Structure formats: C-alpha cells, structure tokens
C-alpha cells in the first residue's frame, strides 16, 4: 500500500513539474506498470503461473477456471 501512495505522490509531483501537462497520463501509465511488475515479482513461482494463466484467459475471452484449494 505504501508503494501505491508513493506512485500517486510521484505522479502529482511530475504533473506539477512538467511544463506541458498533456503528458501526465503517460507518466501515470508507466508508474502503474512499474507497480504491477513490482507486485508480480513479489509472488512465488506457483502464484506467478496462476497469475499468467488467469491473465491470458481473461485477455483471450475464455472463461476463467475456478481454482479450488483443498488445504
């Protein structure tokens, strides 16, 4: 959550510092991508596999299989 606040603060600072403010959505996009990559890297190998399976299924329009854990 702290990283999310950091991204928001940095985006606001860049929005104020950039003389031509028409590029602030591009900066926001890159900060969000960095945040997603950071969160992905925190996952272990099994969670990464499930993450990509879920993402690819959603992007291709196929129904997402329900994962049932019998722990």
Curated annotation (Swiss-Prot):
The chain crosses the membrane at residues 17-38. It comes from African swine fever virus (isolate Pig/Kenya/KEN-50/1950) (ASFV). Keywords: Glycoprotein, Host membrane, Membrane, Transmembrane, Transmembrane helix. It is found in: Host membrane. It is a single-pass membrane protein. Residues 39-69 are extracellular. Belongs to the asfivirus X69R family. The lineage of its organism: Viruses, Varidnaviria, Bamfordvirae, Nucleocytoviricota, Pokkesviricetes. This is Uncharacterized membrane protein X69R. Glycans are attached at residue 53. The keyword Transmembrane applies. Residues 1-16 are cytoplasmic.
């Amino acid at each position: 959550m702290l990283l999310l606040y950091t991204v928001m603060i940095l985006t606001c600072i860049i929005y104020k510092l950039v003389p031509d403010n028409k590029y602030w959505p591009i900066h926001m996009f890159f900060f969000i991508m960095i945040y997603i990559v950071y969160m992905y890297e925190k996952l272990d190998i099994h969670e990464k596999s499930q993450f990509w399976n879920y993402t690819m299924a959603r992007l291709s329009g196929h129904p997402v299989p329900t994962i049932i854990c019998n722990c």
